[in-house]
Amino acid sequence: MTNIVTRFAPSPTGFLHIGGARTALFNYLFARHHKGKFLLRIEDTDAARSTEEYKLGIIDSLKWLKINWDNDIFYQSANLQRHVNVALELVKSGKAYYCFTSQEEIDLQRQLAIAQKQSFIFRSPWRNNIPSSLSLKNNNKAYVIRFKAPNHGTTIINDYVQGKVVFQNQQIDDMILVRSDGTPTYMLAVVVDDHDMGITHIIRGDDHLTNAAKQIALYDALGWKAPAMVHIPLIYGPDGTKLSKRHGAIGVDAYQKMGYLPEALCNYLLRLGWSYQDEEIISHERAIKLFDIDGLGKSAARLDFDKMLYLNGYYIRSTDNSILAKLVIEILSKQYILSNESCNLIQKGMSGLKSRANLLTDLAENAKIYVLENQLTFVNEALNIIQKTPSMLITEVIDIINNLQELNCESVKQSLTEFAKVKHMKLGQLMDPIRALLTGNTKSPSIFEVIPILGKIHAVKRLADIEAIKSNNQ
């Protein structure tokens, strides 16, 4: 295969949504798999809707997903004159023309077509009226430049996913290339930029399939080779309808804030429309090794939030404790001024914490048991257990902990197990109030692990608060 060059070309009129992220991922993986180039082009020609915030948001989301591009970012707005010059070349060669039809006249034609129950394809009276159009142009009458699209025969797209797609040229209108204000349209700019950037393959949503027919006609008129087309099905919501905000979070930044890991989100998006045998868990490196467009499916993919959450939990449990601790500390630092001791406790307790969390935000919430700056809050079930527990029982537990020569999981487990037998209690009956006092909850990592991590001083202090907790919650 020739040197592959792909691109992702978002418009900064909103944040990066997961459909766009999947498109970027597929283009990135295809280029990396074939040792080609993946380029990023910001299509910022819509000045009214494009913002710096959205542009930076898209770039940050791609970086977070580790979808790294080659070369500098290409900004479409920096190439406007080139776009216009190409349109003028088409006019000169008779493949585009100046059109002076007003929008009001076009709207009237559309209304007549609707009234006659006909599909509307605008046919400009200026298409072949070159002398008159030049005269009006010289008299400064407002105009647009339209492409003289082929009006007979067919345009064929040999798409890698959709197969052979045939468009009747009589159904393709003469699209505007340059607006009346002198700015190029998307349809012109995308063709010129893809050509100039040397793009060999375009992977994008199948909602662009109709655009592809117009763009290929434009490539033909310019005598340029069109990139290979790969139109993938869109992502749908769990109910089978087009993905929208009513289905929940659709922006990559929202998933980041919710506590998803980039590796998990990429793994999930990879499997939305692409497959390799029955593999579900596919790392970034393995995805680069395996990905090719022959694995892309033709059927629409549906979001499955449960599967996404499961994958995230898997990646949390598979991630190194030190990396998770750093991420959790970053989250908790927005709420607390964490001491070095608290950070160390979070690091030590990560093994037990991560086995119970599917989201980083949940992991951070659970890690609060090791934040010494945090005033424990107690769930109602924990308070009920504490109220029913004799304070003398906890006093004896405190004595056991204080008298341990070595404080570790084994010593705590052995001593508390023996104490429960002496008291003729089931071990769980003893653990429940200890857990409630140490964590404020009825669920936590193993108490045999929590006590050594907290250490004697902090564990004993929390246990000794039993009377105060009882009196404050009567």
UniProtKB/Swiss-Prot annotation:
It catalyses: tRNA(Glu) + L-glutamate + ATP = L-glutamyl-tRNA(Glu) + AMP + diphosphate. One of its GO terms (molecular function) is tRNA binding. Keywords: Aminoacyl-tRNA synthetase, ATP-binding, Cytoplasm, Ligase, Nucleotide-binding, Protein biosynthesis. A motif ('KMSKS' region) lies at residues 242-246. It comes from the Bacteria. Belongs to the class-I aminoacyl-tRNA synthetase family. Glutamate--tRNA ligase type 1 subfamily. This is Glutamate--tRNA ligase 2. It comes from Orientia tsutsugamushi (strain Ikeda). The gene is gltX2.
